[in-house]
């Protein structure tokens, strides 16, 4: 594909062809800036990575709106396009070269489908899929091999269920959702009542709702509650190996990284970001636009827009100051001991 074809399809107006229309190389693929070879398109996200322009073997670059970087690329004969959001444009460009596998609609003969299930149009149901009573599947849904769908589940249009995921009873999956392999949606919440003779099992009669455009990573689990619902909001993206307990309410547009765990009844507002291995205690709330850095332990509510770190969670700026002091503790301790010894000597005079 010619570079000119790429900028046309991406609808980019600021690019090197306006200055040198004859330099229009063939681009055959995409690559990271430090791995790119001739005929590759790559990107640089900001001025602090400008040194890569002198080192890369890429034939084309997506650059920020920085004239110095554009001139540097031009001097090396690298064609470029510019945008306020290079990473976003790079993501859009990938789709010009790669499309994920999409099977042709069919129902495989080994699939087991209960006669009361309702299947929409243009649906793919792969080998050894099990669909139980009362299930409703929308149009254009893709269900890869070995998926198990429990009774009375609803799956919205164009959603994709990858191999070996499980959707348990009465779960509601919205449109354009993607659920990756090994995920379990709607499993029983951890509900046991202590008695004198042991634990009494509380039946989990609730259900899980995934709103439209939710992505669920591999081996993530989202539990249903004893009553009511566990809900994941519109356009929220959840990584691999995340545990979301019974009754959690997750707002729209959140991003949750791997190995995060939420206890029961946690509430996240809109656009909350959780980095890897965050733990959130029972019933804690995080306000709209708040962020928790990696390995944060959240025991209490977090205000809207607040960034927290550490265990127990504290404001991120304070956490950084504590970290700076922590690395100096040995020297500070030695200075303290010296002062203490001097004080002891003076007190003995």
From Swiss-Prot:
Pathway: Bacterial outer membrane biogenesis; LPS lipid A biosynthesis
One example GO MF annotation: N-acyltransferase activity
UniProt cross-references to InterPro entries, sorted A to Z: Hexapep, LpxD, Trimer_LpxA-like_sf, UDP_GlcNAc_AcTrfase_non-rep
Any one GO BP annotation for this protein: lipid A biosynthetic process
Active site: 246 (proton acceptor)
Any one Gene Ontology cellular component term annotated for this protein: carboxysome
Record family assignment: Belongs to the transferase hexapeptide repeat family. LpxD subfamily.
Annotated HAMAP family: LpxD
Assembly, per entry: Homotrimer.
Name recorded for this polypeptide: UDP-3-O-acylglucosamine N-acyltransferase
Organism from which the protein derives: Nostoc sp. (strain PCC 7120 / SAG 25.82 / UTEX 2576)
Taxonomic lineage: Bacteria, Bacillati, Cyanobacteriota, Cyanophyceae, Nostocales
